[in-house]
């Protein structure tokens, strides 16, 4: 039986303005693999995006309709099937364009590169290319909020033993991109694998072994066990 914390997400999602007064953020727990799909919207302009649509698409679209959002883009944090399986249906239902990293083998309308900035209404999403879990992995940042897909979880990181995975690349993604961000950066991952639904980079630096000070070789050895 699911615990009450997960039940509350199934019934209500997160429906609070976490970023600033004009922006809506919804973290939606979907499917049997504990995936998170995100709906983010400019409340004033009534436009938004969806990150990683997979299952429970009626639930996702209910959130969109309830907030009267015109979904402009679908972002994929990487090309694994459990983060992209809902792309086609959501695109058909909303007319949204699919955005993924330029190296992603999946069908996309727009190819994103490192440091690209995509504007949706007043919202500006910055793309960080963060290979390691997957060659085409990206993180998306708006204000102090970072959507990490399977690159970084609460309390852990994405596995690197799947096709396209590389512990060396993941180490570099952490060292050169994520660890350079402010400690107050809020982490929203691609799965509900941690003890908490979301975290901060400062907290993860202290408690997540993946971000502990260590050499690249030490990190590779840990990830290869």
Regions found by a protein language model. Give the residues of each.
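Residue-level signal for inorganic ion chemistry
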Residues: 40, 52, 78, 90, ...
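Active-site HxH/HxHxD metal-binding segment of metal-dependent hydrolases
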Residues: 34, 45-48, 55-127, 206-210, ...
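Hydrophobic alpha-helical positions that pack around
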Residues: 130
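Hydrophobic residues at beta-strand termini and immediately following loops
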Residues: 28, 112, 201
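C-terminal regulatory/interaction regions
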Residues: 2-19, 225
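Metallo-beta-lactamase
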Residues: 46, 124, 134-225
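Conserved beta-strand hairpin/beta-sheet module of binuclear metal-dependent hydrolase folds
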Residues: 15-67, 139-149
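Hydrophobic residues in well-ordered beta-strands that form the structural core
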Residues: 51, 98-100, 148, 189
């Amino acid at each position: 039986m699911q615990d009450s914390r997960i039940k509350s997400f199934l019934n209500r999602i997160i429906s609070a303005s976490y970023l600033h007064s004009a922006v809506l953020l919804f973290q939606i727990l979907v499917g049997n693999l504990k995936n998170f799909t995100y709906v983010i919207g400019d409340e004033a302009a009534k436009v938004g995006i969806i990150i990683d649509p997979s299952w429970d698409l009626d639930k996702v679209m209910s959130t969109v309709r309830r907030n009267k959002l015109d979904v402009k883009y679908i972002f994929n944090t990487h090309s694994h099937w459990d983060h992209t399986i809902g792309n086609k249906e959501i695109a058909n239902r909303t007319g949204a364009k699919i955005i993924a990293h330029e190296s992603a083998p999946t069908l996309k309308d727009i190819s994103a590169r490192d440091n690209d900035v995509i504007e949706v209404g007043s919202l500006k999403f910055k793309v960080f290319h963060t290979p390691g879990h997957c060659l085409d992995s990206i993180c998306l940042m708006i204000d102090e909020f970072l959507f990490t897909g399977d690159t970084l979880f609460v309390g852990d990181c994405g596995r690197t033993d799947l096709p396209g995975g590389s512990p060396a690349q993941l180490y570099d993604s952490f060292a050169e991109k994520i660890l350079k961000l402010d400690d107050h950066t809020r982490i929203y991952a691609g799965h509900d694998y941690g003890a908490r639904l979301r975290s901060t980079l400062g907290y993860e630096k202290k408690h997540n072994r993946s971000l502990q000070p260590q050499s690249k070789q030490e990190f590779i050895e840990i990830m290869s066990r």
